[in-house]
Amino acid sequence: RTCFITPDVKSKPCPPGQEVCYTETWCDGFCGIRGKRVELGCAATCPTPKKTGIDIQCCSTDDCNTFPLRP
């Protein structure tokens, strides 16, 4: 599997056993100016948000976790 990985936002091979790509987004103090923070990566299973306000989307095809567009 290959997924986009931050901070480079480049497609890279995932480690063995990690077949899920994810896009994690959340707001910080600059959300109104810069938009949501974004983390892209690989995982063995879809991660669970650690706190409220974090949105995680998962997919399982190569490079499916593209950087989200600002609305």
From Swiss-Prot:
Compartment annotation: Secreted
Tissue expression summary: Expressed by the venom gland.
Disulfide-bond pairs as recorded: C3-C21, C14-C42, C27-C31, C46-C58, C59-C64
MF-aspect GO terms: acetylcholine receptor inhibitor activity; ion channel regulator activity; toxin activity
Cellular component terms (Gene Ontology): extracellular region
Keyword Magnesium: no
Keyword Secreted on entry: yes
Keywords tagged on the record: Acetylcholine receptor inhibiting toxin, Disulfide bond, Ion channel impairing toxin, Neurotoxin, Postsynaptic neurotoxin, Secreted, Toxin
Annotated signal peptide: none
Entry-linked CDD domains: TFP_snake_toxin
Annotated family: Belongs to the three-finger toxin family. Long-chain subfamily. Type II alpha-neurotoxin sub-subfamily.
The protein's role, per its UniProt record: Binds with high affinity to muscular (alpha-1/CHRNA1) and neuronal (alpha-7/CHRNA7) nicotinic acetylcholine receptor (nAChR) and inhibits acetylcholine from binding to the receptor, thereby impairing neuromuscular and neuronal transmission.
The protein, known as: Pseudonajatoxin b
